[in-house]
Amino acid sequence: MNQYNEISTLQYMGSKARIISHICDPIIKNNSIQTVVDLFAGTGSVGYALKSYKNVISNDIEYYAYIINQAILNGCNFSELEEASFWAVVEQKYMLLQEKVSTALFAEKTFFVDNIDYKLYQTFCEKTPSVFEPHSDDPRMKELTELVSHVIPGNEPALDFPCLFLTYFANAYFGIAQCCQIDALRSAIEQVMDEHTKNVLLTVLMSVMSAAASTTTHFAQFLKVKSKSTCNNLLTKRKINIIEECKELMKEYRKSGLCSKKEYTTFDCYNLDFSECLDSVVLNKSTLVYADPPYFKEHYSRYYHVLNTLCLYDYPAMAINPQTHEFSIGRYREDRRVSDFGKKAKALGAFETLITKCATAGAWLMISYSDNSIVDITDLQTLAEKQYDVLIEKVELSHSKQGRSSISKVDEYIFICRPKEFVHDVNEKLLVIKELKPIVDNPAGFMHNYMARKPYNVVSEIIKRFCPDNGCVYDPMFGSGTTIIEASKLGRKAIGTDINLLAYKLCKTSLSRWDLNQVEIEI
């Protein structure tokens, strides 16, 4: 079994780390596959595992995922001296932000002790102002309330310091000090000139945020103080110093070689809808598209919207709940994208688009999908088998449910779709052949007179159109050997059989001008 490289990024719902060998082993064993398109790359575990073996093209419609894949596939060249200067800038920015909301920060620290009254902390969190609820009558929040008044969602604030997380997510997804740390880090990253280094630093920050967030395992909604136990859990997370944790993770990334790329090995990364990506990359018989599409109606833009906001850092307009006409509880972006694979009415059609685009180009296709998803496994199999020869592997998994202790059994199916040779654009190819005037006087076969000799130019055209380069042609009744001869001339391997011993001798004579090592002739 192959050993695959792993790297720590996010606590991610769609990670394929547990089935990585089931995905990568058949790809690596197939020497005809040179390029793998990781179409729904997520946190890039598949692409990162394969990059030592194949050319990898990464794509994901979510911007945070695009940044992560750029980082782990292409790395950066970031010296220890440059890193030390970076942390100095971060500390300066953090000190500035601490001064802006010093009263709220001092109050927050008083809760970072044992045996507090959880109701006091509950009130403190509920009184925290934000762009969603800009007013607070808590005097400890006076500075933060003033800061919030300068920020209008959807507009860049006229301030000379960063405060997006402080004004959007304080005491929601993160503590107040943590939001100051995130804003300081993000502002310092923006000042880094090299895009590769920016991507790596953003990935480090996202990884730490994922572990420190006041959530279960994602960012669909933040946890609230409702009891002593939830209060203790939240305070444990909010005591985490995000700057210091980023420094520690950078050490791991540096050990992995991710920060010391002397020459960039370029892996292309895209931030496109799956269909747009398939139209943008070169697909052919040496390409495999790995597709791990969304399984459910709950969309990744909902679960990881905070990370998109971090990467874009654009003070976004926020989504309104159409039923309550108020801001969504999860504080989602207005511009969240929704995949057709997550819509029951459109998911099967999306699969048909995926399969058809890949099959038409003659590319290999691998799909991973679970048995409790929107599209029934049998329907997906039927759809794939219309255009591919399909091998299916079932992998049994156990899933926890969003941080709960309950475990559910799930079957993950891996569809390995091998191109059906010679099926595409058949009508066009037959029309071309019809236009040919058959020529029987084969220069290679003139030395004998065989009654049913095939037109050599028609045979040649058939081989060129339907047999791939370095492919093999088999003629079960080769007769005078026209098919074998033309295949040899065109650089294909050839296998021929004929019950007639005279045909064997005639064909072997005809082939004396060519390399017989390319040809196997059996009676």
Describe the predicted segments one by one.
Residues M1-V37, S45-Y53, I68, S405, ...:
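S-adenosyl-L-methionine
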Residues Y4-N5, K16, I20, L144-Y304, ...:
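SAM-dependent nucleic-acid methyltransferase catalytic core
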Residues S32-V89, E298-Y315, R453-I523:
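Conserved S-adenosyl-L-methionine
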Residues Q34, S286-L288, A363, G471:
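Conserved acidic residues
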Residues A71-P162, Y168-F169, K505-I523:
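Conserved phosphoryl-transfer catalytic core
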Residues E334-D389, E393-V395:
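Conserved Class I SAM-dependent methyltransferase catalytic core
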Residues I377-F422:
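Class I S-adenosyl-L-methionine
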